[in-house]
A protein has these predicted regions:
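Non-heme di-metal
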Residues: 1-182
């Protein structure tokens, strides 16, 4: 009597003999099924972007601290309100990215704790100028990251954060416009 075994049955036998051995190559359909598993959002593909995400978290937290500091020194109630709102939004961005980090790694991200120090606030217009450029660069960096990642969900999140950063830059420009005398 002839024994006809499928490739899967043969593979199972070899797995019992030596679990590290793969004597039968994976078929194209098995590879496609394995690839389909890795396509999901925040999966293996997103691991490549984990250092970028860490950097974005730290940047958002730094921006939040800066906005809170600038809000305390703002010359007008409108400026104080805007900077408090921007600080809250930057904190929200950091929390979102920390959630993304957890989805990818299964670990809670612990941000670096800055050493307390005296914050030197330059002239008000200079603060607005610096923050405008920081927000614009942040928008650009998120857009670039969205183009470079292979994870679809990360692409959407990075694009959303890019739009927020550009919106922040426009709000700061509006505040700066009010400071210009004609």
């Amino acid at each position: 009597m002839e024994n006809h075994q499928t490739t899967e049955q043969k593979r199972a036998i070899w797995q019992r003999v030596n679990p590290t051995l793969q004597p039968y190559p994976i078929t194209a359909e098995q590879q496609a099924a394995q690839d389909a598993v890795n396509v999901c959002c925040m999966g293996a593909e997103a691991q490549e972007d984990i250092d970028v995400i860490r950097g974005f978290i730290e940047e958002e937290l730094s921006d939040r601290r800066g906005y809170l500091s600038y809000a305390a020194a703002a010359p007008t109630p409108n400026a104080r309100q805007l900077f408090r709102r921007l600080a809250a939004e930057e904190g929200g961005h950091a929390r979102k990215l920390m959630g993304v980090y957890y989805l990818i790694t299964g670990q809670v991200y612990c941000p670096a704790v800055p050493l307390p120090g005296k914050t030197c606030v330059p002239g008000w217009r200079e603060v607005l100028r610096l923050r405008y450029h920081e927000e614009s660069c942040g928008g650009l960096n998120y857009r670039r990251a969205s183009e470079e990642t292979s994870d679809e969900c990360l692409t959407e999140i990075f694009l959303e954060l890019s739009r927020d950063e550009y919106r922040h830059a426009r709000q700061i420009l509006c505040l700066l416009e009010k400071q210009m005398l004609i």
